[in-house]
């Protein structure tokens, strides 16, 4: 049987999906903006 694909790791999570990672690209900034306008409690990982 294959191993589980999700191996939680907080550093990897933040580096890939965190706020600063989002702000690095134009598309990421668009995501943050969309989540802000929607009124999300949490903007990113």
Swiss-Prot record:
GO molecular function: structural constituent of ribosome
PROSITE patterns, A to Z: RIBOSOMAL_L34 (PS00784)
GO biological process, one term: translation
Sequence intervals crossing the membrane: none
Keywords in alphabetical order: Ribonucleoprotein, Ribosomal protein
Coiled coil: none
Gene Ontology cellular component annotations, sorted alphabetically: ribonucleoprotein complex; ribosome
Tree of life domain: Bacteria
PANTHER family according to UniProt: LARGE RIBOSOMAL SUBUNIT PROTEIN BL34M, MITOCHONDRIAL RIBOSOMAL PROTEIN 34 FAMILY MEMBER
Family statement: Belongs to the bacterial ribosomal protein bL34 family.
Designated name of the protein: Large ribosomal subunit protein bL34
Species whose genome carries this gene: Kocuria rhizophila (strain ATCC 9341 / DSM 348 / NBRC 103217 / DC2201)
Gene label: rpmH
């Amino acid at each position: 049987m294959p191993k589980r694909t999700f191996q939680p790791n907080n550093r990897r999570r933040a580096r890939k999906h965190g706020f600063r990672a989002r702000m690095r690209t134009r598309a990421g900034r668009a995501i943050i903006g969309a989540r802000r306008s929607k009124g999300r409690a949490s903007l990113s990982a």
